[in-house]
């Protein structure tokens, strides 16, 4: 115990010097490195904590420090806004430690990291589906979590992003009209599918109006074709 306290104090002192940090990187005293990584993490120096922990997770595997080091590595990436790497680290954590100390938080932050990394609605939404999946899994595993409502709110926001992408597509089809085909029909199909998949969306009214307008245009052209 006394030895651990001394190592922790020495690690904390090391943080004051950039030169000492470079020496620390070359050190083979892994317990010392681990305590230094924890101190860097506590001080918000996440780049340094991630660098050290990335080396240590393999070395510490099978020890009582392995679990905490992997979770801390994920949070170090998360706090640097490297959300993809953070999510993968959290996923590795809860797959390795399904009943671990930080499993609830790891599952939550895996979903939230992917949520924060999703693109704007006009772009490919593969990562949005992945974020929804992770957040839904979090809620299934931890239905009584204090973070359940936040997870649910993120899912609703992600679903709205998917609806918005469909709304943009439906608008485009409507504006194209009969150019190179019956785009009004494509507008109706796209809008109706969005309404079917997400019946409680905030964009329900706009999608419904697009369906009515597109059908109206289809009816007009149908009458003209029969003349």
Predicted regions and their residues:
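Acidic, polar-rich low-complexity tracts and alpha-helical solenoid repeat scaffolds
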Residues: 2-6, 17-227
């Amino acid at each position: 115990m006394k030895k651990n306290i001394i190592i922790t104090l020495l690690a904390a002192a090391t943080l004051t010097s950039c030169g000492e940090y470079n020496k620390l990187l070359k050190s083979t005293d892994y317990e010392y490195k681990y305590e230094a990584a924890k101190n860097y993490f506590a001080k918000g120096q996440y780049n340094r904590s991630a660098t050290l922990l990335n080396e240590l997770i393999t070395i510490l595997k099978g020890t009582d420090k392995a679990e905490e080091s992997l979770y801390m590595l994920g949070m170090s990436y998360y706090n640097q806004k490297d959300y993809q790497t953070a999510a993968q680290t959290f996923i590795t954590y809860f797959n390795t430690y399904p009943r671990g100390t930080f499993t609830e938080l790891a599952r939550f932050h895996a979903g939230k990291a992917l949520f924060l990394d999703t693109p704007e609605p006009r772009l490919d939404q593969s990562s949005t589906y992945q974020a929804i999946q992770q957040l839904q899994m979090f809620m299934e595993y931890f239905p009584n979590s204090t973070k359940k409502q936040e997870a649910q709110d993120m899912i609703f926001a992600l679903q709205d992003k998917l609806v918005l992408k469909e709304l943009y597509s439906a608008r485009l089809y409507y504006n194209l009209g009969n150019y190179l085909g019956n785009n009004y029909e494509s507008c109706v199909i796209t809008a109706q599918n969005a309404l079917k998949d997400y019946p409680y969306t905030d964009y329900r009214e706009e999608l419904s109006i697009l369906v009515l307008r597109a059908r109206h245009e289809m009816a007009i052209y149908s009458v003209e074709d029969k003349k």
